[in-house]
Amino acid sequence: MILLAVLFLCFFSSYSASVKGHTTGLSLNNERLYKLTYSTEVFLDGGKGKPQDSVGYKISSDVDVVLLWRNPDGDDDQVIQVTITAVNVENAGQQRGEKSIFQGKSTPKIIGKDNLEALQRPMLLHLVRGKVKEFYSYENEPVGIENLKRGLASLFQMQLSSGTTNEVDISGDCKVTYQAQQDKVVKIKALDTCKIERSGFTTANQVLGVSSKATSVTTYKIEDSFVTAVLAEETRAFALNFQQTIAGKIVSKQKLELKTTEAGPRMIPGKQVAGVIKAVDSKYKAIPIVGQVLERVCKGCPSLAEHWKSIRKNLEPENLSKAEAVQSFLAFIQHLRTSRREEILQILKAEKKEVLPQLVDAVTSAQTPDSLEAILDFLDFKSDSSIILQERFLYACGFATHPDEELLRALLSKFKGSFASNDIRESVMIIIGALVRKLCQNEGCKLKAVVEAKKLILGGLEKPEKKEDTTMYLLALKNALLPEGIPLLLKYAEAGEGPVSHLATTVLQRYDVSFITDEVKKTLNRIYHQNRKVHEKTVRTTAAAVILKNPSYMDVKNILLSIGELPKEMNKYMLTVVQDILHFEMPASKMIRRVLKEMAVHNYDRFSKSGSSSAYTGYVERSPRAASTYSLDILYSGSGILRRSNLNIFQYIGKAELHGSQVVIEAQGLEGLIAATPDEGEENLDSYAGMSAILFDVQLRPVTFFNGYSDLMSKMLSASGDPVSVVKGLILLIDHSQDIQLQSGLKANMEIQGGLAIDISGSMEFSLWYRESKTRVKNRVAVVITSDVTVDASFVKAGVESRAETEAGLEFISTVQFSQYPFLVCMQMDKAEAPLRQFETKYERLSTGRGYVSRRRKESLVAGCELPLHQENSEMCNVVFPPQPESDNSGGWF
């Protein structure tokens, strides 16, 4: 009895999870003609637009379906013929009246006579257990038309029972889930699982990346094992993580309804499908049901040379701070990606000196085999006449949004050759490190060129051929961040000379906290507490910063106990570092609060040390989903001369992080200028000042203001006060391209690009007469982000273009008056006002040229401000720059 009950339950559950019928898929009755209506429509908008604001189009028709053959040995093996007739094309959703691009146009005029004939030729489907085994059509039909037929054919693929399986249809090989109910089946396609060959790429860093969501749901209403209605809806939505106003949405709908059935032709006899197909028409060929790539030919578009001529003025040096320069740069990159090597090389060779650097930025950023060949043919690394162009090429390589192995291989080949400039040789190796990291992030760590590059970097540190090459390989490792390089970094950090030791600790500072193990911290603690040798303040404070990323109780306790025993300015610096961690609630703050509960650690004498060095972190912007932070720390020598200033900007979105910029100015050995005594461990340092920068996670080659006492004096005597440029150029920062095969047969495309023109410069001024020094770091940028979303049927196209642009600036000024002790220090961070402009263009366009366009724009002004630092700094600035008394305008003598 129990066994019977179990069998009954199994039978009942099977029955309730499937639609009534004897087949596993759709089944047609013999000698019946099924007459249906079919429509596919598509809507595009900017993501949050109202339906009535969308653009798009609708293709509708009648559809005739007949059963041509059924396998005598099984009902689930059949061949059906599907014929599209009475085609019409119109606006989707709202009617535009006279503004409609279809107004007064017949279907043959819109689609084209040949296209319409191809669309209305019958197609054959071989269905086995409800799935399309073969799709038969005629050879050499236009791809766009074939895809529309594939979109309709895919609707006939379904099963009548619940379950999850993999299916091949127009979208590719996809995971599909069926939910069967009484006379109804819901089919959910997991679009993110679809395997289909399509071109595309995206930016690896999530902060600069694109978030997307795709859904596909098809509902079948079934009667007598055939459909009475099919409703399919596919949605594709995206948004740029960094700028949520850059967004788009595509909604594609299909509708198939049974209107009537009537007497149809007799079935074709036979046991073999091949014979049946041949009997219908020998010209039928089996072709893939997976959507094919629709290549778009640009009619009447300008040549590359004509395009360059039209935008060249925008890329002249004096115009680079404007958004128009970046907009032209982005548009030209798109054209370069479809151009041949010869065309690109011709423009490079013909261009004049002042615009060539910007052209090199664009050609390198195109990242195609042709553009790479052209730029490598053009540049001569053995010549010192094009050093600026060589450096711009290398920086563009470092910022590459989707580098490939070929680019890395090209730089490795160049590194093995000879150079006119040692600076360029160093830059090549530093950028090789950046490419290694990007390729590894994209699962390319085992590529042959990556393995070779890693071996070169690590080998250069293990056994450098020349002592001066050590810095170069450390900078390369600072970009590559290879875990296997950590033991070498610890060796150089502890045993290396001052500048090398400091650089090695700054490299460790860039590693993720998971790599800062107890073994690493053991070495860093020895450096900070000087257990084996005396280290410079810059080395010790950097070692402490790495330890405080993830400190143990004893790490924190020993660092806090050291405050009060350190050199004067280092005391103050470490004190403000701890206060900054607590103020900004950094990960180490909880451990520090625990340790501060000990009376021996937390006492007034330790935490009341005077000095001018400082560390401070604050927010530039903050929202529930994103934050932008700035941090500024300055370390002085005991005599009041700048030792190091470090300005950082980070962008966070969720758990993703982007090191937007870092500008470090370092100086040493300058005490002799004011007859001051150097700090412990820094008595024999050569006079030096220089600047180092990280930009968008890429370490650039440092620049030197002066090196050595004689160089310092000559620079002081001949100083013009002009800033030294650290990096200047056009950068492609956001780069997302995606071809999408919609299940309706239409082709969609998403292009999102973001670029900027950037100029980071720095200067250091001394006045022995006024006993004052000034340090300036100036950032100027123009940013443009564009997106273009299109849906193309080959004869009609709809699209939404969005653009956001701004011009902004950030300046840091540090003024030190060292005529007394404690010396006076004033730090200022000024954010310039920034205009923000947003544009949106929606359009519909026929291949014949007729179009509809809708435009919107929005402008606002973000006010400038002075970013706040700590209270002590504000008080000091009031002393350095006392408020001016109001002038008396009475006009009298008394």
UniProtKB/Swiss-Prot annotation:
Deletion consequences: Lowers plasma and tissue triglyceride levels, and increases cellular free cholesterol.
GO biological process, one term: lipoprotein transport
Catalytic activity of the protein: a 1,2-diacyl-sn-glycero-3-phosphocholine(in) = a 1,2-diacyl-sn-glycero-3-phosphocholine(out); a 1,2-diacyl-sn-glycero-3-phosphoethanolamine(in) = a 1,2-diacyl-sn-glycero-3-phosphoethanolamine(out); a cholesterol ester(in) = a cholesterol ester(out); a triacyl-sn-glycerol(in) = a triacyl-sn-glycerol(out)
PROSITE patterns named among the record's database cross-references: VITELLOGENIN (PS51211)
SUPFAM superfamilies listed in its UniProt record: Lipovitellin-phosvitin complex, beta-sheet shell regions, Lipovitellin-phosvitin complex, superhelical domain
Lineage: Eukaryota, Metazoa, Chordata, Craniata, Vertebrata
Record's subunit section: Interacts with PRAP1.
UniProt keywords, alphabetically: Cholesterol metabolism, Disulfide bond, Endoplasmic reticulum, Golgi apparatus, Lipid metabolism, Lipid transport, Lipid-binding, Signal, Steroid metabolism, Sterol metabolism, Transport
Name of this chain's protein: Microsomal triglyceride transfer protein large subunit
Highest taxon in the source lineage: Eukaryota
Ranges of residues in domain Vitellogenin: 28-658
Function text: Catalyzes the transport of triglyceride, cholesteryl ester, and phospholipid between phospholipid surfaces. Required for the assembly and secretion of plasma lipoproteins that contain apolipoprotein B. May be involved in regulating cholesteryl ester biosynthesis in cells that produce lipoproteins.
Pfam families: MTP_lip_bd, Vitellogenin_N
Keyword Transport attached: yes
One Gene Ontology MF term: protein heterodimerization activity
Subcellular location: Endoplasmic reticulum
Induction data: Up-regulated by FOXO1. Expressed in a circadian manner in the liver.
An example Gene Ontology CC term for this record: vesicle
Cysteine-cysteine disulfides: 174-194
